[in-house]
Swiss-Prot record:
Protein name in the entry: Two-component response regulator ARR8
Residue ranges constituting the Response regulatory domain according to the UniProt record: 10-145
Modified residues (4-aspartylphosphate): D78
Pfam families per the UniProt record, alphabetical: Response_reg (PF00072)
Organism annotation: Arabidopsis thaliana
Family indicated by similarity: Belongs to the ARR family. Type-A subfamily.
Domain of life per record: Eukaryota
Name of the encoding gene: ARR8
Length: 225
């Protein structure tokens, strides 16, 4: 088993041929992928944290050595392998609730239309004829992006609370600025009114005094005319 750890997408490559494993590994690395290679379908299931029940070959159980913390974005497997074929591996992955969303691509050196149709109907994303070319691997990026986007969508968005509370903060700041402006206007208006009130007050007093002087007085009693 070989692992490269610095790539964006993580691909699990399955092939019983050492030459074909090395070939697909190099092509995937040129496509900036992290690659894990295994030589059988059973080892692929073991890496995912699954194993076939000895009592029931059709049933899957959790392996004691679980690798579920390692994110796999795509599985590419040879079709013709001893023991578990690529088609069998495809079915096992699609039967697993935890891993059925992982895209699976089948490779084969034999162009058999019925085999290709069966794999695609079972859920394979692509069926490549060997030798696989670098141009073929460009078709894998959209499939790998699906798993990345799904993982990101499942993450909780902590910033949501900040976004919700932000308008309330701005509204409070706006209200406080209005409150600060209002006293300023009131202060200016009061300063402008004060001399006017003083002037009006003087005029009123002068009018009272002049009125008092014009009224006749009898024994210090003012009579209204």
């Amino acid at each position: 088993m070989v692992m490269e750890t610095e790539s964006k997408f993580h691909v699990l490559a399955v092939d019983d041929s050492l030459f074909d494993r090395k070939m697909i590994e190099r092509l995937l690395q040129k496509s900036s992928c992290q690659v894990t290679t295994v030589d059988s379908g059973s080892k692929a299931l073991e890496f995912l944290g699954l194993r076939v029940d000895d009592n029931d070959p059709n049933a899957l159980s959790t392996s004691p050595q679980i690798h579920q913390e390692v994110e796999i974005n795509l599985i590419i497997t040879d079709y013709c392998m001893p023991g578990m074929t690529g088609y069998d591996l495809l079915k096992k992955v699609k039967e697993s609730a935890a891993f059925r969303s992982i895209p699976v691509v089948i490779m084969s050196s034999e162009n058999v239309p019925a085999r290709i149709s069966r794999c695609l109907e079972e859920g394979a994303e692509e069926f490549f004829l060997k030798p696989v070319k670098l141009a073929d691997l460009t078709k894998l990026k959209p499939h790998m992006m699906k798993t990345k986007l799904k993982k990101e969508s499942e993450k909780p968005v902590a910033i949501e609370e900040i976004v919700v509370s932000k308008p309330e903060i701005e509204e409070e700041e706006e209200e406080s600025s209005v409150i600060e402006i209002l006293p300023l206007h009131q202060e200016i208006e009061s300063e402008q009114l004060e001399p006017m009130l003083s002037s009006n007050k003087r005029k009123a007093m002068e009018e009272v005094v002049s009125t008092d002087r014009s009224r006749p007085k009898y024994n210090d009693i003012t009579t209204s005319v």
